[in-house]
Amino acid sequence: MDIFTLLMIAAGLSMDNFAVSLASGCNPNIKIKDISKAALLFVAAHLVMFSLGWFGVSVIAERFDAYDHWISFGLLVFIGLRMIKEAAAKKGQQECVNITETFSRLLLIALATSMDALAVGISLSLAGVHFVLSVAAISFFVLITTFFGFKIGGKLGDKLGIKAEIFGGIVLIGIALKILLDAMM
């Protein structure tokens, strides 16, 4: 596999966390340390899932493949509905939820957005792609897209307020549906 293809796979893999970061960046009170914490946790979750896929190809592929899409779907729908519910409960307030406020929320989002990395780890391992190069590409894209997502979301958040949070919840549910439909096709 050529480097360009690997970079495109890494970029595609990072789009889920970009969408979450974009929607969550609308919180005007989010600090750079919170963004850094989210970015590092997103990278760590992607690397763990990618490594599980890479090194556990024969064991995990057979046992986990049957329901990984259901786990991703369930987590993303749960988080998406929760974001929409919290936004609707604000009754006109212009503050977005800080996904970094609680570690459990951030961890759930990191795990939900990294499920695809398991399948990518399996695929790239079977394709014979270099592990360190794959890890470097994925880490780079997840880190950069998370930071840019939060920053762009921060610029749009002043104008969008609660609408951005509702949109973020809808985006998560859309990603969940896409994961489920892709798995069923």
Curated annotation (Swiss-Prot):
GO terms for cellular component: plasma membrane. It is a multi-pass membrane protein. One of its GO terms (molecular function) is manganese ion transmembrane transporter activity. The chain crosses the membrane at residues 3-23, 40-60, 64-84, 102-122, 124-144, 165-185. It holds the Pfam family Mntp. The keyword Protein biosynthesis does not apply. InterPro entries: Mntp/YtaF, Put_MntP. It is found in: Cell inner membrane. The keyword Cell inner membrane applies. Keywords: Cell inner membrane, Cell membrane, Ion transport, Manganese, Membrane, Transmembrane, Transmembrane helix, Transport. Coiled coil: none annotated. HAMAP family: MntP_pump. Probably functions as a manganese efflux pump. Belongs to the MntP (TC 9.B.29) family. This is Putative manganese efflux pump MntP. The gene is mntP.
